[in-house]
């Protein structure tokens, strides 16, 4: 990938993360409560996933947001 393509890819990822964050906040009844849940999950992940290196470029807070949105919007993921 050349430098221009990398910038475009990173830009798209940022927009996806922002969209997912807004989606999570809109779904939630209480923004404060969901923010605390995300922070606690990210803190747990930071210490639990020290040995697991899936993608070191994704910070625990971003991973927590993306996982929580998927869990809420796609409950069939959890039931499987």
Swiss-Prot record:
Reaction catalyzed: RNA(n) + a ribonucleoside 5'-triphosphate = RNA(n+1) + diphosphate
Swiss-Prot/TrEMBL keywords: Chloroplast, DNA-directed RNA polymerase, Nucleotidyltransferase, Plastid, Transcription, Transferase
Highest taxon in the source lineage: Eukaryota
GO molecular function: DNA binding; DNA-directed RNA polymerase activity
Enzyme's top EC category: transferase
CC annotations in GO: chloroplast; DNA-directed RNA polymerase complex; mitochondrion
Localization (cell): Plastid, Chloroplast
Biological process, per Gene Ontology: DNA-templated transcription
EC number: 2.7.7.6
HAMAP family attached to this UniProt entry: RNApol_bact_RpoZ (MF_00366)
Protein role: May be involved in RNA polymerase activity.
NCBIfam families registered for this protein in UniProt: PRK00392.2-5
Family membership: Belongs to the RNA polymerase subunit omega family.
UniProt name for this protein: Putative DNA-directed RNA polymerase subunit omega
Organism: Gracilaria tenuistipitata var. liui
């Amino acid at each position: 990938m050349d430098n221009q393509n990398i910038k475009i890819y990173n830009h798209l990822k940022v927009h996806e993360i922002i969209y997912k964050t807004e989606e999570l906040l809109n779904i939630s009844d209480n923004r404060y409560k969901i923010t605390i849940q995300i922070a606690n999950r990210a803190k747990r992940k930071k210490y639990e996933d020290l040995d697991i290196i899936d993608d070191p470029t994704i910070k625990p807070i971003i991973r927590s947001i993306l996982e929580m949105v998927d869990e809420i919007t796609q409950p069939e993921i959890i039931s499987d």
